């Protein structure tokens, strides 16, 4: 199943190793809007574009930081367990279904509405005790230059959940995923 980085790995397997892959399933559907549809957008597509615009302008700083200066954030996070916790829990607040409107406007949300305190502390501890914040940030730096949007022909399942960061309409997804068997 591919969500977040799992989506990138899943799509790489489905696109580059189709002879050894029976199919893929992603819930972060990565692709590009079809320019030919821009004059005939559905209401959902307009909402998807607005959400992506909001994400790029207001919620993408972590990604830019890690993709361009991974060591800086890596040293900062390796220096403070509280800093490490804040960095991660802030993402849980923004990216879990814990009381947000799509687009990030908080309506009293708290991550514990979606995850237990223990689950969040387990995640923070995994990064802190292994001192892996910098290497995790470098994944962005190493990977962004090699991302592709090549076609995928293996059978593909796509799940769209209400507050996913990335959303495509089916017609846009079909530009990349050529054999969608579940939507």
What name fits each language-model region?
Residues 1-49:
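Conserved hydrolase catalytic core segment
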Residues 4, 34, 40-43, 59, ...:
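Acidic-enriched, low-complexity/disordered segments with a strong bias for Aspartate over Glutamate
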Residues 16-19, 27, 60, 131, ...:
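Detector for Asparagine
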Residues 28-29, 50-55, 104-105:
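Short, surface-exposed, polar/charged, turn-prone segments marking secondary-structure boundaries
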Residues 39-70, 150-151:
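The feature captures the conserved acid-bearing segment of alpha/beta-hydrolase catalytic domains
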Residues 66-183:
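C-terminal subdomain of alpha/beta-hydrolase-fold enzymes, centered on the catalytic histidine
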């Amino acid at each position: 199943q591919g969500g977040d980085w799992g989506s990138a790995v899943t799509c790489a397997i489905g696109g580059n190793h189709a002879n050894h892959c029976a199919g893929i399933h992603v819930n972060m559907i990565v692709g590009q809007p079809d320019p030919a549809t821009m004059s005939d957008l559905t209401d959902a597509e307009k909402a998807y574009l607005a959400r992506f615009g909001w994400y790029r302008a207001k919620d993408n700083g972590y990604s830019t930081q890690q993709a361009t200066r991974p060591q800086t954030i890596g040293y900062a996070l390796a220096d403070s367990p509280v800093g490490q916790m804040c960095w991660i829990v802030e993402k849980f607040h923004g990216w879990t279904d814990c009381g947000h409107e799509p687009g990030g406007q908080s309506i009293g949300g708290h991550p514990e509405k979606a995850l237990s305190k223990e689950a969040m502390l387990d995640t923070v501890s995994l990064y802190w005790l292994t001192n892996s914040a910098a290497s995790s940030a470098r994944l962005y730096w190493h990977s962004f230059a090699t991302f592709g949007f090549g076609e995928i022909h293996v059978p593909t399942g796509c799940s769209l959940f209400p507050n996913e960061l990335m959303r495509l309409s089916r017609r846009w997804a079909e530009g990349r995923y050529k054999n969608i068997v579940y939507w």
